[in-house]
Curated annotation (Swiss-Prot):
Comp. bias intervals (Basic residues): 984-997
Main location: membrane
Protein localization: Cell inner membrane; Cytoplasm
EC number(s) stated in the UniProt entry for this protein: 7.4.2.8
A GO CC term attached to the entry: cytosol
Stored Gene3D superfamilies: Helical scaffold and wing domains of SecA, P-loop containing nucleotide triphosphate hydrolases, SecA, preprotein cross-linking domain
Subunit structure and binding partners: Monomer and homodimer. Part of the essential Sec protein translocation apparatus which comprises SecA, SecYEG and auxiliary proteins SecDF. Other proteins may also be involved.
Protein name (Swiss-Prot/TrEMBL): Protein translocase subunit SecA
Keywords, ordered alphabetically: ATP-binding, Cell inner membrane, Cell membrane, Cytoplasm, Membrane, Nucleotide-binding, Protein transport, Translocase, Translocation, Transport
Binding locations of ATP: 84, 102-106, 582
Catalytic activity: ATP + H2O + cellular proteinSide 1 = ADP + phosphate + cellular proteinSide 2
Composition bias type Basic and acidic residues, residue spans: 957-971
Alphabetical list of PANTHER family matching this protein: CHLOROPLAST PROTEIN-TRANSPORTING ATPASE, SECA INNER MEMBRANE COMPONENT OF SEC PROTEIN SECRETION SYSTEM
Length: 997
């Protein structure tokens, strides 16, 4: 194991050494030359011309990086460090750069962005929320504009026109969800002017900020565009009432109980519930039905299961909050609210019924994709985060991305203390309060991380109400009494009398008795515990001002986080992932100055305002004063910013002397990575700092995944909440529990991807062919329509004209009725004459007749109108069929695991069934399009000529089948044979296709 770790670190060191030689040294050599350039944009244009003439991006990297560094120096007052140049190179190579908090990931991205923008295909910088997208675009905008590049930013409220313009920019800042939904909406567009992504190379290169959050934490979350589906909502209320009447029991357990007890059992690890026989009978009685799981009642059974899951597994203020009569999901990884996102399969409706709010109608999926498959569509992708190495295996296996740990500019000096473990959650929270009180009294800033809104508010309540701490004092007092019961004498009697009123004890009351207590042993331990409890209560009574940052109180988020490093500051926050504001010791003077100027009417994101603030904070007052005159900033504002700078500087020195920012984790997360993100908020850029996690065996991680043997051992040893548990077995148990959960979650994500890959291949085919219809030339659209007509007529005819059956026995009446249902224009076709032909010839005769009827239809409508009709019909039929196909795949997936009981591999079964459903859908599309094109009545005003849509080359879809809508790619078409009619050539192609099948 040590050898493996050593090899991993050696590999990383070798990579870093390579970057120093190939990137850092050449860029540094160019610095003096680039500093003298009067026009950086002109120099950048020269690089672009070189690239167009064949120079590779790797060859142009040193100069592109040097120009970007100089642009940042000129327009932001920031110079890329050498390690930041390495980070830029890592991103350019399509890898993940692990960079610690405060190392300037936002600035690093500009290097890879500027280099890859030379292609002219557009670069997407993907962030986790609108605030960061806007902030980073406006903050880094001057760097790009200094090179002559345009910058776009997309927000949730952006209009289609604004989105189109932003995506056409050289650099686009956008959130992962907006980008994914724009992709899905583009693939539902019915005219080219509805598209917002670029027509050519829509997904060229993406740099994903907080890449672990998006590609791992969010991997199981599908992006879904949906429309309303009809389903009665009052049933959900009824199911919520029935769920209340059913009682939770215990599962069957070997050697303990043969059968499960109660009406249902709960499996928290998998978030599933199982009705017992007793529960099924009770539910049937309450519903007034028989056979809850019979086919006709399956919908009721599903709704009841979801109602029980809502009752037992989804908790208010942890998994969701209720706000303005709506159930809003809380992101379990970031603690942020996710308005607009809903649980699927009726679970959200079940929660709404449980909470008694109005139930929104269930939706039907119109388009869907997971982040895993969406980001794999990019020609090149890269990522940045503070924590990725622990998940490197997953990044490599699923995304083909290596992780490179970029060295910090200054060494990390933060101290990470061992975990403190308590038997119960109550004991753990008392200990956390004691630690907060101690740090607050010293003046050291504290950031407390919790995993839910409920826990953050509980801790806040304990700090506000000293009476909630009294049980801890009483417990400490009992322990001291027990330890001192054999002690005798007048002094001891005085002490015992004093201790009769514990709530009124003060530090000075206990001081005179210090000499009674021996320096070591149980009595000393109990005495120190009592003194600490008395002192903590006194600090709580004086008050511990604190800020709570969670999904309920997020409006002042950036301000709270920016000032969390000031002395005597206590901040309680749910998970800190994705909170993009640096915590600077002594407070963030830049943020305070920006807030001050904003109040005075200045745009804090305007690049000259930002540059002015940076110059003032850095003490470069002459340069700042010149900018102030240009911007119209008054002298008194300069003085106030100077005061802010000095206050923060003095406070920074005070906080450094106290040990920097201290991080307290109130619970270990399922993933070590999330714990590391919290730790990483302290010790930025070589600052001092510390961290410690408090854990209890009541925490979800330990309760669900820790070893039963360890818990049984603790029970036998009689551990209570008076002191933390310190044992190597406990520490190992925590590590093993986290590893177990990480492995399990990776397996789930891998399985999700396996199943989603089946859908992904089908989606790529449908979307690529759909895009061809939307953006292709008129002749390609006509070719597709004619192909569908031919395929449909031939397929219908072959069902009746069997070559192995004598022509006299062919059911020509049935054939006629079937074909006329599709193409009424064949009414006058001489069906009886077919008996004189061979089956193949008869089929071709019918196809030829259908094509003539189609040409007549086109002449009747006019070619431009016919093309418009073809586009409209094909796109609408495809969209409706795809929507139904997605529903069918959902139903298939929900029940596929039952096939495991029949000794069949569920995935293989899913693959086979999904392929069958896809082929049926394709056949249905062709049939419906043919029927619509023959039967559609066009009633319109005199038609104006329809302009041909601009032709844009569409990349080939990778997966099979390569042809769906009847458009034969030129490379797949057999060479024309002299003397053959078009129909004969088509027949040969159909025979070739059949042979391949």
């Amino acid at each position: 194991m040590l050898g493996l770790l050593r090899r991993l670190f050696d590999n990383n060191e070798r990579e870093i050494a390579r970057y120093y030689k190939q990137v850092v040294e050449p860029v540094n050599r160019l610095e003096a030359e680039v500093e003298k350039l009067p026009d950086l944009a002109a120099a950048y244009r020269e690089l672009k011309e070189k690239h167009e003439k064949g120079a590779s991006l790797d060859e142009l990297l040193p100069m592109a990086f040097a120009l970007t560094r100089e642009s940042a120096k000129r327009y932001l007052g920031m110079r890329h460090f050498d390690v930041q140049l390495i980070g830029g190179a890592v991103l350019h190579e399509g890898k993940i750069a692990e960079m610690k908090t405060g190392e300037g990931k936002t600035l690093v991205a500009t290097l890879a962005v500027a280099l890859n923008a030379l292609t002219g295909k557009g670069v997407h910088v993907v962030t986790v929320n609108d605030y960061l997208a806007r902030r980073d675009a406006e903050w880094m905008g001057p760097v790009y504009r200094g090179l002559g590049l345009s910058v776009g930013v997309i927000q949730h409220a952006s209009t289609p026109a604004e989105r189109r313009k932003a995506y056409l920019a050289d650099v686009t800042y956008v959130t992962n969800s907006e980008l994914g939904f724009d992709y899905l909406r583009d693939n539902m567009a019915i005219s080219p002017d509805q598209l917002v992504l670029r027509h050519d190379h829509p997904l060229h290169y993406a740099i994903i900020d907080e890449v672990d959050s998006i590609l791992i934490d969010e991997a199981r979350t599908p992006l879904i565009i949906s429309g309303p589906a009809e389903k009665a909502t009052d049933l959900y209320y009824k199911m919520a009432e029935i769920a209340k009447k059913l009682e939770r029991g215990l599962p069957a357990e070997p050697g303990v109980r043969k059968e499960p007890t109660g009406d249902y059992t709960v499996e928290e690890k998998n978030r599933s519930v199982h009705l017992t026989l007793q529960g099924i009978a009770k539910a049937e009685k309450l519903l007034g039905i028989e056979g809850l799981f019979s086919p006709e009642n399956m919908e009721l059974a599903h709704m009841l299961i979801q109602a029980i899951r809502a009752k037992e597994l989804y908790h208010r203020d942890r998994d969701y909050i209720v706000q303005d009569g709506q159930v809003i999901i809380v992101d379990e990884f970031t603690g942020r609210l996710m308005p607009g996102r809903r649980y699927g399969e009726g679970l959200h409706q079940a929660i709404e019924a449980k909470e008694g709010v109005r139930i929104e109608r269930e939706n039907q999926t119109l388009a869907t994709i997971t982040y895993q498959n969406f980001f794999r569509l990019y020609e090149k992708r890269a990522g940045m985060t503070g924590t990725a190495k622990t998940e490197e295996k997953e990044f490599q296996e699923i995304y083909g991305m290596d992780v490179v740990v970029v060295p910090t500019n200054r060494p990390v000096v933060r101290k990470d203390f061992p975990d403190v473990v308590y038997r119960t959650e109550k004991g753990k929270f008392y200990a956390v309060v004691e630690e907060i009180a101690e740090k607050y009294e010293r003046g050291q800033p504290v950031l407390v991380g919790t995993i839910s809104i409920e826990k953050s508010e509980r801790l806040s309540q304990m700090l506000k109400e000293p009476r909630l701490y009294l049980p801890r004092l009483e417990m400490r007092l009992e322990l001291f009494k027990k330890a001192s019961q054999k002690q005798q004498g007048p002094e001891w009697e005085r002490l015992r009398k004093l201790l009769e009123r514990p709530a009124q004890l003060k530090d000075e009351d206990l001081a005179p008795f210090e000499g009674l207590i021996p320096p070591k042993g149980n009595l000393r331990t109990a005495w120190e515990g009592l003194k600490r409890a008395v002192h903590t209560l006194a600090v709580l009574r004086q008050g511990i001002p604190h800020q709570v940052l969670n999904a309920k109180h997020h409006a002042r988020e950036a301000e709270i986080v920016a000032q969390a490093g000031r002395s005597k500051t206590v901040t309680i926050a749910t998970n800190m992932a994705g909170r993009g504001t640096d915590i600077k010791l002594g407070g963030n003077p830049e943020y305070l100055a920006a807030a001050l100027l904003e109040k005075e009417g200045f745009d804090r994101y305007e690049w000259k305002v930002e540059l002015f603030i940076k110059k003032m904070v850095a003490g470069k007052e002459e340069e700042a004063r010149a900018l102030a005159q240009e911007l119209g900033i008054r002298e008194e504002l300069l003085e106030r910013i100077r005061e802010i700078r000095e206050e923060c500087k003095q406070d920074e020195e005070r906080v450094r002397a106290l040990g920097g920012l201290f991080i307290i984790g109130t619970e270990r997360h399922e993933s070590r990575r999330i714990d590391n993100q919290l730790r990483g908020r302290a010790g930025r850029q070589g600052d001092p700092g510390g961290s410690r996690f408090y854990v209890s065996f009541d925490d979800d991680l330990m309760r669900l995944f820790a070893s039963d043997r360890v818990i049984a051992m603790l029970d036998r040893m009689g551990f209570d909440d008076s002191e933390p548990i310190e044992h190597p077995m406990v520490t190992r148990s925590i590590e093993r529990a986290q590893k177990r959960v990480e492995d399990r979650n990776f397996a789930i994500r891998k399985q999700l991807l396996q199943f989603d890959d089946v859908l992904s291949r089908q989606r790529e085919v449908i979307y690529a062919q759909r895009r061809l219809i939307l953006l292709g030339k008129d002749e390609e659209v006509k070719e597709a329509a004619i192909g569908m007509v031919e395929e449909t007529v031939a397929s219908l005819a072959e069902n009746f004209l069997n070559p192995e059956v004598h022509p006299e026995d062919w059911d020509l009446e049935g054939l006629k009725a079937t074909l006329l249902d599709t193409a009424p224009q064949l009414q006058d076709f001489p069906f009886a004459e077919l008996r004189a032909l061979k089956a193949e010839e008869a089929v071709e005769r019918l196809v030829e007749a259908a094509l003539k009827a189609y040409e007549a239809r086109e002449a009747e409508l006019s070619p431009p109108l016919m093309r418009a009709v073809e586009r409209f019909v094909i796109l609408n039929v495809v969209d409706n069929a795809w929507k139904e196909h997605l529903h069918n795949l959902d139903v298939l997936r929900q029940g596929i695991f039952l096939r495991g009981y029949g000794q069949k591999d569920p995935f293989q079964e899913y693959k086979i069934e999904a392929t069958r459903l896809f082929n049926e859908m394709v056949a249905f599309i062709k049939s419906e399009v043919a029927k619509f094109l023959f039967r559609l009545k066009v009633e319109a005003e005199p038609v104006r000529p329809v302009r041909e849509a601009p032709y844009v080359p569409v990349p080939e879809a990778k997966p099979e089948p390569s042809e769906v809508f009847g458009v034969e790619r030129k490379r797949a078409t057999p060479p024309p044979q002299p003397g053959l009619s078009r129909a004969e050539r088509r027949r040969l192609m159909r025979q070739e296709k059949k042979r391949k099948k």
